[in-house]
Regions:
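Glycine-rich, proline-tolerant flexible connector loops at the mouths of alpha/beta enzymes
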Residues: 65-91, 95, 99-100, 127-137, ...
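Conserved small/polar residues in nucleotide/adenosyl-binding loops
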Residues: 182-184
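Short, well-ordered coil/turn segments that N-cap beta-strands
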Residues: 26-29, 63-65, 91-97, 119-121, ...
Length: 184
């Protein structure tokens, strides 16, 4: 971010036989803004592409180096927004954009179509893992739900092979907190 050295660090207390508490963070973490992602399609008055560009430029000015910009396979506005960023060369070389998509083949394909000519991107896939959704919505076993994640990951890796830019993969289990320890 802008100036992570602005604040003085606290002095650590050295205690014998202690290991990890003595570790220190000596550089700023990587912050990823998710302010532009997912949900635009659900708003009564969604942001326009122009508003999203203005917001993106502000995040860049603030110093964000990773910006999750949307769910281009779920919303035409978010798809168009990403394409404008790329076509108008608005993504700085030191900024990596991130896109979100469910771990479903047709959505992953559409996501990679939206990323054409992006230099660096994180493809963030997810699938639901909660017992309720697994049983009621998907009518699938725990193993079948795991397979969705595995197949989605394989598909992202396959598309990434032919992608001209740099692709990083991020996976998240949706509704993970609803699983419970017995179901992990």
């Amino acid at each position: 971010m802008l100036n992570y050295k602005k604040y003085k660090r606290f002095e650590t207390i050295k205690l014998k036989d202690r290991t990890w508490p003595d570790n220190e963070i000596t550089k700023a973490p990587i912050w990823c803004s998710v302010d532009l992602r997912d949900g635009n399609q659900a708003l009564i008055n969604p942001m326009t592409v122009e508003e999203k560009i203005e917001f993106f430029n502000l995040l860049v000015k603030l110093g964000f180096k990773e910006i999750e910009i949307g769910f281009p396979s779920a919303s035409q506005i978010e798809y168009d927004f990403l394409r404008r960023l790329v076509d108008e060369n608005l993504i700085p070389d030191d900024v990596m954009v991130q896109v979100l998509t469910q771990a479903r083949p047709h959505l992953i394909k559409r996501t990679f179509e939206s990323l054409k000519n992006v230099k660096k991107a994180i493809v963030h896939i997810y699938n639901s893992t909660s017992v309720l959704q697994r049983d009621v919505v998907f009518n699938m076993s725990k193993e079948e739900i795991k397979e969705i994640a595995v197949e989605g990951t394989k598909l992202v890796k396959e598309y990434a092979k032919d992608f001209e830019g740099e692709i990083l993969l991020e996976y998240s289990p949706e509704s993970f907190t609803e699983i419970g320890r017995a179901h992990v």
